[in-house]
Amino acid sequence: MASSAFNEAHRTSDPHYRIMKNQKIAVIQLQLNHGPDQNLAKCSQWVEKAAHQGATVICLPELCASHYFCQHEDTQHFDLAEPLGGATFERFSVQAKSLGVVIVAPFFERRMPGIYHNSAYTVDADGSQAGLYRKMHIPDDPQFYEKFYFTPGDLGFRSARTQHGHIGTLICWDQWYPEAARLT
């Protein structure tokens, strides 16, 4: 009993803790096969629609700006990568702030020459970057030639504090490994 009372008092005194009621989470799945500008515009339309339907956390598909291109090994796809703070973050930072929502926006990250990641921003409702996740488990199977493109992530599994709760991000194959869910 005392432990329960202590935990409740501790949680409510934490400025980052609030009781979340009726959170609506939108997971957007759509076909992306155009250039980055068109794909980002299409994703933005769906973010807008989800927010207007009451979603407070909106998750976009893997590699949302570029599309999933890993079915073939082609060096031209490296041209689709962007640095941190690039077009994906810029677009969804403005949109998250405008709509007051959290957006999980996966993208093809160019960390430095020769080092690329399959990454995702967690953009808070004020437009700031609340988190960055780099996919840890990289498959190399027929139609999933990801090791040709991506270096395994080095940021670990952790959650990001946002105005709409703590968000733990995993990308595709990472969800098959139980430690990822336990640690985020």
Q: Where are these predicted regions, by residue range?
A:
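Active-site catalytic loop in hydrolytic enzyme cores
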Residues: 82, 94, 111-184
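Hydrophobic positions in the central parallel beta-sheet of the AAA+
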Residues: 26-28, 58, 168-170
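Cys-nucleophile CN-hydrolase/nitrilase-fold catalytic domain and related Cys-dependent amidase chemistry
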Residues: 36, 45-126, 132
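Extreme N-terminal starter segment of soluble prokaryotic enzymes
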Residues: 21-25
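Short, Lys/Arg-enriched N-terminal segments with co-localized hydrophobic residues
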Residues: 8-19
